[in-house]
Amino acid sequence: MSGKDDYYNRAKQEGYRARSAYKLQQLDDTAGLLGEGRTVVDLGAAPGGWMQVAAERIGERGTLVGVDRQTIDDLEDPEPTVEYVRGDMTEDSTKDEIREIVGESDGSGGPVDVVISDMAPNMTGQYDLDHARSVHLVRQAFEVATDLLDAGGDFCAKVFDGQDLDDLIADIEPEFEYVREVRPDASRDSSSELYLVAKHRLTGPVREGDIVEATIEDIGEEGDGIAKVENFTVFVSGVEDGETVEVRIDDVKPRYAFAEPVE
């Protein structure tokens, strides 16, 4: 028996509902998605293997919401708060139900720390078609994620490799600090699946390369000027307190950015 098939037997022995549970374990070990106390939304959660792993890792202070068109059987004695939403993730009513569960954010983004998706299309055996359908599912999940994620939040979704992958990544990248491709060891050797891990949701009004006018309101401990762009903090090098200058955004983080004056 191959090591890949062995994951199926391990899942049965260890009480996981699907072998995909090990993929999420490996993704979390690699990318740090499921920290203690985080609020997690699992899209396309049935039968619940990813929910089992998420519940173990976010602990009693966490909140976990499983979303699927199918009924998800309740987890056995989970530590965190666990809720189930039966519905279409693209419908406003479904997103409203999620928000009712997790509440509103205190920050500039949504109320959720992590959105994960292991969804796959019904397979046709036609590689290009299956790839295109998987890309469409990721785009739908991405739309939900950008609506729900708080500043600094993370997004992880399965996609099949193919010709549209680069365009998909290019569309996701501006909304996060970075995006990487991860292929868990638990994926079958014959599978073209990979996971896009997008870290640190950006909700500020600026992006890398933007040129904006900034008034320096203070000087920080490191000597950089401190400006506000729509209440978003921008650190500007080589300026003095009280100056109003055009600056180019060099780097963007979830809660602040770095810039230099335009010469």
Swiss-Prot record:
GO cellular component: cytoplasm
Annotated catalytic residues: K158 (proton acceptor)
Chain residues that bind S-adenosyl-L-methionine: G48, W50, D68, D88, D118
InterPro entries (alphabetical): NA-bd_OB-fold, RNA_methyltr_RlmE, RNA_MeTrfase_FtsJ_dom, rRNA-MeTfrase_E, SAM-dependent_MTases_sf, TRAM_dom
Localization (cell): Cytoplasm
Entry keyword 4Fe-4S: no
Gene3D superfamilies assigned: Nucleic acid-binding proteins (2.40.50.140), Vaccinia Virus protein VP39 (3.40.50.150)
Residue intervals of the TRAM domain: 205-263
Record EC number: 2.1.1.166
UniProt entry tagged with the keyword S-adenosyl-L-methionine: yes
A single MF term (Gene Ontology): rRNA (uridine-2'-O-)-methyltransferase activity
PANTHER family cross-referenced by the UniProt entry: PRE-RRNA 2'-O-RIBOSE RNA METHYLTRANSFERASE FTSJ3, RIBOSOMAL RNA METHYLTRANSFERASE
Function: Specifically methylates the uridine in position 2552 of 23S rRNA at the 2'-O position of the ribose in the fully assembled 50S ribosomal subunit.
Cross-referenced HAMAP family: RNA_methyltr_E (MF_01547)
Family, as annotated: Belongs to the class I-like SAM-binding methyltransferase superfamily. RNA methyltransferase RlmE family.
Designated name of the protein: Ribosomal RNA large subunit methyltransferase E
Lineage: Archaea, Methanobacteriati, Methanobacteriota, Stenosarchaea group, Halobacteria
